[in-house]
């Protein structure tokens, strides 16, 4: 059995075995489960109540153990693991505060983003010490390259933080974030292979594919467990950093188009509401609810319908990226 196959099945099987025990453990220590926003679609208040969160612990454990055993400790893999675990810690604190207060509010958005950016910027600055001037260059598409020079570290940190929070926003329906994560890691792993990136980055993608697939088994509608911020923030950061390490940050925006759309829907909604409130005295909304997957729920789409259609969009965009933009 070759190394990629061994890593995939190890992460998948370990996650599949660990998940049921972890779900039972979470139900014992937290009977209320993940707090649900009162403004959420009505069915969420019924179907998602008392569902345990922090399932990201299973994904991270199942992913990182094979890396620890079989993947060489290159600068790339050390940075990936360090950033992923750092963002997992931020997510854990956020989840813990929510569960403790039995509220959907944890760390404030400003505090969370500030800590994330500092962590990512420090990580990228230290990593730069291992590389030549090519580190500051990135590909746009079709071999076109741009050099960010001294601005590259902040740019890379922005990608990591943006990806982290975009995945967090997407994690609002059963199976939605997990399917998008799997599709994105498959695409980034394929791009990494085709561009002859460091093998450790490819193996990193493979182990997260296996672990997230096993989690998805228990996260499909009706979900038995949610990944929580400890999962979405850390895995989102891992996705963004993977695109940075293979120098395909711009292409990641196409591959992860759903993450981009989810984030933009929130930004547009907030800005439009503030603008109309300032101009007319009363705020107006463009969407029924954001992130945009909730808008489609309010329109009458089922959770599974949204998850599958969003996945189709991601697959089409990924194929387009590999076929025409790489």
Curated annotation (Swiss-Prot):
It is an enzyme of class 2 (transferase). Catalyzes the initial step of the lipid cycle reactions in the biosynthesis of the cell wall peptidoglycan: transfers peptidoglycan precursor phospho-MurNAc-pentapeptide from UDP-MurNAc-pentapeptide onto the lipid carrier undecaprenyl phosphate, yielding undecaprenyl-pyrophosphoryl-MurNAc-pentapeptide, known as lipid I. HAMAP family: MraY. It catalyses: UDP-N-acetyl-alpha-D-muramoyl-L-alanyl-gamma-D-glutamyl-meso-2,6-diaminopimeloyl-D-alanyl-D-alanine + di-trans,octa-cis-undecaprenyl phosphate = di-trans,octa-cis-undecaprenyl diphospho-N-acetyl-alpha-D-muramoyl-L-alanyl-D-glutamyl-meso-2,6-diaminopimeloyl-D-alanyl-D-alanine + UMP. The gene is mraY. GO terms for cellular component: plasma membrane. One of its GO terms (biological process) is regulation of cell shape. Pathway: Cell wall biogenesis; peptidoglycan biosynthesis. It is a multi-pass membrane protein. Its cofactor is Mg(2+). The lineage of its organism: Bacteria, Pseudomonadati, Pseudomonadota, Alphaproteobacteria, Rickettsiales. One of its GO terms (molecular function) is phospho-N-acetylmuramoyl-pentapeptide-transferase activity. Its main location: membrane. Keywords: Cell cycle, Cell division, Cell membrane, Cell shape, Cell wall biogenesis/degradation, Magnesium, Membrane, Metal-binding, Peptidoglycan synthesis, Transferase, Transmembrane, Transmembrane helix. The chain crosses the membrane at residues 3-23, 51-71, 77-97, 113-133, 143-163, 175-195, 199-219, 225-245, 250-270, 306-326. It is found in: Cell membrane. The keyword Cell wall biogenesis/degradation applies. It holds the Pfam family Glycos_transf_4. Belongs to the glycosyltransferase 4 family. MraY subfamily. It comes from Wolbachia sp. subsp. Brugia malayi (strain TRS). Its EC number is 2.7.8.13. This is Phospho-N-acetylmuramoyl-pentapeptide-transferase.
């Amino acid at each position: 059995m070759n190394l990629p196959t061994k890593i995939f099945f190890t992460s998948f099987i370990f996650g599949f075995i660990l998940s049921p025990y972890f779900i039972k453990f979470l139900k014992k220590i937290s009977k209320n489960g993940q707090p649900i926003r009162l403004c959420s679609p009505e069915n969420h208040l019924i179907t998602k109540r008392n569902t345990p969160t922090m399932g990201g612990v299973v994904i991270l454990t199942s992913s990182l153990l094979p890396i620890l055993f079989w993947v060489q400790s290159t600068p790339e893999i050390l940075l990936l693991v360090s950033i992923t675990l750092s963002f997992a810690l931020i997510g854990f604190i956020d989840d813990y505060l929510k569960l403790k207060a039995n509220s959907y509010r944890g760390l404030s958005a400003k505090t969370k983003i500030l800590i994330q950016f500092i962590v990512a910027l420090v990580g990228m600055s230290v990593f730069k010490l291992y590389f030549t001037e090519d580190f500051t260059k990135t590909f746009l598409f079709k071999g076109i390259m741009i050099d960010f020079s001294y601005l590259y570290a902040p740019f890379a940190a922005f990608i990591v933080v943006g990806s982290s929070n975009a995945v967090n926003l997407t994690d609002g329906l059963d199976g939605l974030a997990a399917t998008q994560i799997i599709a994105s890691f498959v695409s980034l792993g394929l791009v990494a292979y085709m561009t002859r990136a460091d093998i450790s980055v490819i193996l990193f993608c493979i182990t997260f594919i296996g672990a997230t697939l096993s989690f998805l088994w228990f996260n499909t509608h009706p979900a038995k467990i949610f990944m929580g911020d400890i999962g979405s923030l850390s895995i989102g950061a891992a996705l963004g950093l993977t695109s940075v390490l293979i120098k395909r940050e711009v292409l990641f925006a196409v591959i992860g188009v759903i993450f981009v759309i989810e984030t933009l829907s929130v930004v547009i909604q907030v800005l439009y509401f503030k603008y109309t409130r300032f101009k007319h005295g009363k705020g107006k909304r463009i969407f029924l609810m954001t992130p945009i997957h909730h808008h489609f729920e309010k329109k009458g789409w089922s959770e599974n319908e949204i998850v599958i259609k969003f996945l189709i969009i991601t697959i089409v965009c990924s194929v387009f990226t590999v076929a025409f933009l790489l």
